[in-house]
Design a protein with these regions (language model features):
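Alpha-helix-loop-beta-strand connector modules within alpha/beta enzyme cores
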Residues: 1-6, 25-28, 32-46, 75-101
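Conserved alpha/beta-domain cores
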Residues: 1-8, 12-27, 32-33, 51-56
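Generic hydrophobic/aromatic pocket-lining and core-packing "Φ" positions
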Residues: 10, 50, 83, 105-106
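Conserved, mostly hydrophobic/aromatic
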Residues: 13, 53, 61, 86, ...
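Structural motif
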Residues: 16, 56, 89, 110-112
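Short acidic/polar active-site loop segments enriched in Thr and Asp
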Residues: 19, 59, 114
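Glycine-rich phosphate-binding active-site loops on the catalytic face of alpha/beta enzymes
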Residues: 24-33, 62-74, 99-125
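Histidine/lysine/aspartate-rich catalytic loop segments that bind and position anionic ligands
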Residues: 40-43, 47-69
Length: 125
């Protein structure tokens, strides 16, 4: 029972009959509506992003950057306390992202997330 969610490309999700798509924050704000027959996740970086994702009926959100990350080296991380405050204002299931490693899974859960999203930590296994 594995679900495959592709990053940012709705057309490929349909072409390869994938389960869903993870939208970047630009797509979150630009799309007038989300596909109803795909799981849809949204990258969020603020309370407003989470509100938009919820209003457009996203299935989940990915919130960060929680920690310093190589992907966005100039971005000031929000930290776990801010992450928790934003999670508590939303009804969406939320994954933490940004500098996450396997050792952050428990922290994400403790601060209200449902898990982590990561690129480098997964490929490093």
């Amino acid at each position: 029972n594995v679900r495959i969610i592709i990053n940012s490309n709705i057309d490929l999700a349909y072409e390869y009959e994938l389960d869903g798509v993870h939208l970047n924050s630009k797509q979150l704000h630009e799309l007038s509506h989300f596909p109803k027959d795909l799981l849809v996740g949204a990258s969020c970086h603020s309370e407003n992003d989470l509100k938009v994702a919820e209003e457009k009926n996203a299935d989940f959100a990915v919130l960060g950057s929680v920690k310093k990350t190589l992907t966005h080296p100039d971005l000031e991380p929000m930290g776990w306390v801010r992450f928790s405050k934003l999670v508590n204002k939303s009804n969406l299931p939320i994954y933490s992202i940004g500098g996450m490693t396997n050792s952050d899974i428990l922290s994400s859960l403790e601060y209200g997330g449902i898990g982590i999203a990561s690129q480098r930590a997964i490929w490093a296994i």
